[in-house]
Amino acid sequence: MRSRILKLEIVVFASLFSLLISNCNMKDDSKNQITITINSVDKETKQRRVNKFDTVVVRKEGIGYLMKTFDKVGQYVTDSTGSVKIRIDSSKICDISVSGLNVLGGDMYNPGYLKDGQEVNIEVISIENR
């Protein structure tokens, strides 16, 4: 009888210990979240693309064995000032691409490069002029 209780205590202790370990390994994404402002800028004139309403696609590094994969986090549309404010996870590689009517541009940022409240200028180039 005593050995059965001892075995039960060991099983319960091992279960609680493994549960505690698994919860400690889970990342809290809320502390890695930062807010950035993305500006769509014309490469030739170096001015913001005002009233163009470009599409901004944000992707973050995913799981990949031989090649990196980039999972789509969100798709946003710039406002009349040519910018959009978003929240992203700063602990992963971030790929930001901007596309609009006959324009395309993008950039990739490593972890730790983007800071909270930072403005990011993405230069877009006209596809017709290429």
Residue ranges and their predicted role:
Residues 64-83:
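Short, acidic Ser/Thr/Gly-rich low-complexity loop/linker segments typical of extracellular
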Residues 34-43:
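A short, amphipathic beta-strand motif
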Residues 110-130:
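Extracellular beta-sheet/turn segments enriched in Thr/Pro/Gly and aliphatic residues
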Residues 92-115:
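A short, solvent-exposed loop/turn motif at the edges and junctions
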Residues 43-69:
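Short, ordered, surface-exposed loop/turn motifs in non-cytosolic proteins
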